[in-house]
């Protein structure tokens, strides 16, 4: 097997695990600092910020492991329905694939980078694993310089 074939086989195993065995990616949530918590998994970092106005989530992973995210948030004593803002760091499916489900559950406002918004509004066909990113309502845009 060539090096390229080995890499492709390894990537196939990783993708299978991500989509068909998400429980293998479970990670215990933990406090990072003061009011910031890690609620992601071993593959994708997701952060929860507790504010007086409600919860802010930075990224949300993807549909297949949304239940892990919800379990992590609840495990820290928070209610996922209290998420007010979801900030998507970038347009990869594993950082925003569960956005619509979270929006439906909590009615959170979604923030996305202006440059990434193009792919969600104009060129969804250019999103890798597009079928893993259900359409969602974009409420606000942020600039990379902010």
Task: Walk through the language-model features, giving the residues of each.
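Accessory terminal helices/loops
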Residues: 1-22
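Conserved beta-strand hairpin/beta-sheet module of binuclear metal-dependent hydrolase folds
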Residues: 22-76, 80
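Active-site HxH/HxHxD metal-binding segment of metal-dependent hydrolases
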Residues: 36, 64-67, 74-146
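Residue-level detector of flexible, active-site-proximal loop/helix-junction positions
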Residues: 14, 18, 43-45, 64, ...
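A short, structure-level motif marking secondary-structure boundaries and short turns
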Residues: 12, 53-55, 84, 131
């Amino acid at each position: 097997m060539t090096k390229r074939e080995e890499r492709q086989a390894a990537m196939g195993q990783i993708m299978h695990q991500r989509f068909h065995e998400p429980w293998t990616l479970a990670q215990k949530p933990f406090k990072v600092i003061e009011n910031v918590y890690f609620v992601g998994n071993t593959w994708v970092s997701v952060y929860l910020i507790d504010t007086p106005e409600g919860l802010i989530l930075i990224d949300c992973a993807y549909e297949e492991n949304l239940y892990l995210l919800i379990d992590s948030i609840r495990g820290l004593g928070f209610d996922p329905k209290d998420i007010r803002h979801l900030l998507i760091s970038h347009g990869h499916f594993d950082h925003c694939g569960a956005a619509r489900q979270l929006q439906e559950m909590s009615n959170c406002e979604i923030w996305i980078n202006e440059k990434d918004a193009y792919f969600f509004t104009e060129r969804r066909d250019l999103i890798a694993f597009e079928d893993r990113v259900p359409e969602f309502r974009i409420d606000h845009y942020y600039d990379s310089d902010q």
